Amino acid sequence: MTTLLSPQRERWLLFTLAGIQFTSVLDFMIMMPLGPQLTQLFGISAGEFGLLVSAYTFSAGLSGLLATTYIDRFGRKRMMLTLYPLFGVAALACSLAPSYGWLILARVASGFFGGVLMAISQTIVAEVVPFDRRGRAMSVVMTSFSVATVAGVPLALFLVSHFNWHAPFMAIAGMVGLLVVVALKTLPSLKGHLQAHAAGDATLSFLANLRLVLIDPNHLKAFAMSVCMVFAGFAVVPYIALYLQANAGFKTEEIPYVYLYGGICTLISARFIGLWSDRAGKALVFRRLALLMPLPLLAMTLSAGLPQWAILAISSVLFVVMSGRMIPGMALIGASADPRRRGSFMTLNSAVQSLSMGLAAWIGGQILGRDDAGNLTLYWAAALIGGGASLLSFVLASKLRLHGEARTT
C-alpha cells in the first residue's frame, strides 16, 4: 500500500535517503584507497588489510540474512532511526581506532548496521512513491553511489593527505549526525505493513519461504552468477591503491585521480550501457562485458612501468566494465526470480553479494605478497582468478530461465 506525500515532502525524503546512502557507500569505499596508510601504520600484510575490507562485507551479508527475520516487524522510520545512528557510532569508532584489532571490530559493526540501510531505503521508496514515478525516484537515491565515487572518495582522500586517516571517518560520523536530525523531520511513519503475528510464527514463515527460494534450481544458478559477477572485481579492486603506490610510484595525493576519473567515466557510460541493454538485450550485453572483464583486470595488475595517463586509462576502463556488467546482470538476476518470491530472493541475493565481496577481498589478500623492495607480488594471479569468475558468470548467464516479459530481452 502506497502512502502518498506532498511533492515537496517527497523531494526532501528522497534527498534524505540519498544522503543516507552516500554516507553508507563512502564508509565502505574509503577503506580501499586507505590501504597504503593502514598497512604501514599498523604493520600489517596485504592479506590482513584484505580482512579489514572483507570484515565489513561479511558482516553486511550476515546482517542482511538476519534482517529478513525482523525487518517487517517494525515501522520503517523506527528501523532507519535505530540502525542509522548506530552506523554513525560505528564510523566514529573507526575514526578513534588505536589498533588493528579495534579497527576490525569497528568495521564489523559498520557492516552490520550499514548493510541493511539500502534495503530499508528501497522499501520506503516503494511504499511512498507511486509505481509510475518509482524509477525516477529510485534513480535519485542510487546517484549516491556515483557521487560517492566521483566526489566522496577524492574529498575523503584530500582529508587524509591534509590531516590523517581518521579524518574521513570523523566526517562521515558528523554527516550521519546531521542526517539523523533531518530524517526525524522528513521520514514518514510507515506502519501499514505491520501484522500482529507472534515472533515464532514470523520466524517459521521466514524459514519456510527461505526453503522455497533455495530449492528452486533456477534461483541457485542466479545466486551462483551473482557470486561470480561480484567476485570478479573484488579480487583485485581493493588493492589498486596499494599496488599503485608500491609498484607504480603513485604518490598519496595522486590516488584520488583513479577514483575521480573512474567515477566520471562510469557516470557517463552507465546511461549508454543501460540503453544498449534495453535495445540489444540484457543477456547479450552482459555476456559481452563479462568476456571483456578479464582484460582490464589483468592489465591493471600488470600496469607498473606504464605512464601515469595510461594507468589512469586502464583503471577507468576497469571501473566502466565492472560497473557496466551490473546493469544488465542485475536485470537478469531479478528476472530469474519466481515472481511470487522475488522479495525474499532479492534480499538473499544482496546478502550473497556482500558475502562474495568479502570472500573475494580475503582471497585476493591471501594471494598477494611483497618482495624485498616492498613491491606487491602475484597481483596478476588475483586478476586471473577474478577473470575466471567473470568467464564463469558468462556461462551461468546463458543457463538462467527468465520470467515474464524478460524472456524476450
Feature names for model-found ranges:
Residues 32, 219-260:
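Extracytoplasmic gate region of multi-pass secondary transporters
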Residues 43, 75, 96-102, 249, ...:
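Helix-breaking motifs and short loop linkers at transmembrane-helix boundaries and internal kinks
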Residues 161-173, 366-388:
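A membrane-interface helix-boundary motif in multi-pass transporters
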